């Protein structure tokens, strides 16, 4: 595999070389082209560099690639910039300007029988203004994610909350409950206090075994619920969700963008 080399001798990853796409983004070339097309439709070409009289050095596909590579690898801006032949400050501007355009589109239409599955995951987050020490003994945020039980596509992400808060309260405070209004929602037993959520039957306090029919339903519930756990694991293949170094207020759009990339890997 050979890199494209610019006139100053700096190695550059380019979207014109399809062999760079999958290893550095997790997307196949066709999926990446879909991503670029969506960003263009959302106004990506019209976004200015931010410096008076200056044009972007990178084409829109290369800027989209930079964002996807950054999220996938979690390299620092000082590492990402030279890979694309730009300064680290230019890499910052690309991520800040295009990242929000990759966000997951809201679900506008839904069948009333479409079941959602929701779960939370801890995202190690260095911005202590939004993070808190959690059960993993790191400063983290609690990110709520919901998928469609049938398609396994991510349909909603919540606003990250401090990692020491329980799922039962974060479900409401993050806004994801509001996004899922009107459809059945499944979750584990940590979502007590949300009567609209379908949870497994609890073992009686007197120690008796559950009736067989309840035990069977719990088995089915657990099997279906595993789908959201698999989705969260796939989302964390974008390594930025394993150690979030950016300002905390950007995590919501980053997580939503990664949800969109995750969906592209399923739908193409």
What are these regions (language model features)?
Residues 33, 64, 252-255:
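Non-catalytic, well-ordered alpha-helical scaffold segments
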Residues 59-73:
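Short, amphipathic alpha-helical "recognition" segments used to contact nucleic acids or chromatin
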Residues 79-268:
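Short, well-ordered secondary-structure "scaffold" segments embedded in the functional core
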Residues 1-52, 58:
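Charged, often Cys/His-bearing segments associated with DNA-binding zinc-finger transcription factors
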Residues 28, 59, 209-213:
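Ser/Thr-centered flexible coil motifs
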Residues 48-49, 62, 213-215:
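Glycine/charged-rich beta-loop-alpha catalytic/anionic-binding loops adjacent to active sites
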Residues 53-54, 142:
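Short, charged beta->alpha transition segments
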